[in-house]
Each structure stands twice: as structure tokens, then as C-alpha cells.
């Protein structure tokens, strides 16, 4: 049996650009792609914290250390500059692979610079 698990997450990145006429996808600062182990052209799910939109697209590379998060093409109608996004990828793992499984979680500041990286989400308490 395989289980689909959260593989990587960019948590609360800020949209810097929204380009309706650009060829689709989401451009992401190359340093963030590497930190989260997201490959160029990999499928990503985007969750817009500001308006609740959830959509799927693919990642493309933006200039390293630029802080760019640009939502492009038709998806530009789902996010505006300044919106907070969660960008996630998922992968399927066998039970044996799950023994070594750890997601790559990347947390950023207001300028989309890495401030913290973890491999677990803290337990939610009452």
C-alpha cells in the first residue's frame, strides 16, 4: 500500500507579482525551491490564506534570493500581490519508505526570506 503524504511546504509566502498574461504557473525564488525540495515544473498546490482559494499549478524558477512569488496566467485571478499563500507538494510512499519520511517545511519572513526550516509540524493543543 502507498500513502500520499505532504512532501514539502512553503508556509505563508507573500505574493509579489500576479501576471495574468504571463505563460501559466507560479514563479518561486530559486532559493525557496531548493530549501523545500521543489523541482522546476513540479506540480504544486496553492492555498490562498487571504481568500480561501485552493488551486493546482506547477512551479517555475524565479531569480535566486529575489523573494519573488509570482502567480501567473489564469491562476493570477486567484491571488493578488500581498496575499499570503501556502505552497505544498505531495508524494506517495510505501510503508517501508514512511519509516524514513520527513517533510521539508520552510517558513519565511515578510520579504520571503527563509527564517526557519523544520521537518515536523508541532502538535496542536487546546
Swiss-Prot record:
| Binding sites annotated in the UniProt record for substrate | 57, 73-75
State whether keyword Cytoplasm applies: yes
The catalytic activity of this protein is classed by the Enzyme Commission as 4.1.1.11
Q: Which residues carry this modification: Pyruvic acid (Ser)?
A: 25
Chief localisation class: cytoplasm
Q: Cellular location of this protein?
A: Cytoplasm
Requisite cofactors: pyruvate
**Known catalytic reactions:** L-aspartate + H(+) = beta-alanine + CO2
Any idea which GO molecular function terms this record carries?
aspartate 1-decarboxylase activity
User: Superkingdom, according to UniProt?
Assistant: Bacteria
Classification via HAMAP family: PanD
- Name under which the protein is recorded: Aspartate 1-decarboxylase
